[in-house]
Amino acid sequence: MPTPSPFHERTAPLCRSYAWKDWAGYCAVCSYDTSHEREYFAFRETAGLLDVSPLFKYHLHGPDAQMLVDRVITRDASKMAVGQVYYTPWCDDDGKVIDDGTVARLGADRFRMTAADPNLRWLLEHARGLNVAVEDVTEQVAALALQ
């Protein structure tokens, strides 16, 4: 049985469609209304708030955290200010896209990365030889996305 997200108590009464799915072990709304049209136009013309708690979240910290981030994303992490967030693809050494998501700079040597798929092992492989810790904090960090 999927786990309710930390926002489930607020989102469940709004789900008129009763359409739920298992997203990475969490109970997630497929659509709130019986027709997707209202939601579609709300996002296109104004804004929408999504519960994205099921996204996988990783905390990278240590002297080489920025070096690890630069190894796996296509943007330059050295240009990120503390508090800044990038949306970026994650790529392997050949440029093949592994995933995409956000990277937030939390401090000089601290980052949080989010992804749709579980990539802890892949991040740990790329961290080999670096002085950086990589932790899966998915269950400790809830998330909302304003789009």
Where in this protein do the model-derived segments appear?
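Acidic, proline/glycine-enriched N-terminal capping motif
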Residues: 1-91
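Short hydrophobic/aromatic-rich motifs at helix boundaries and adjacent loops
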Residues: 37-42, 95-97, 124-128
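Aromatic/His-enriched, Gly/Pro-containing loop or helix-boundary segments
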Residues: 85-104
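Acidic, low-complexity central loop/insert segments
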Residues: 99-147
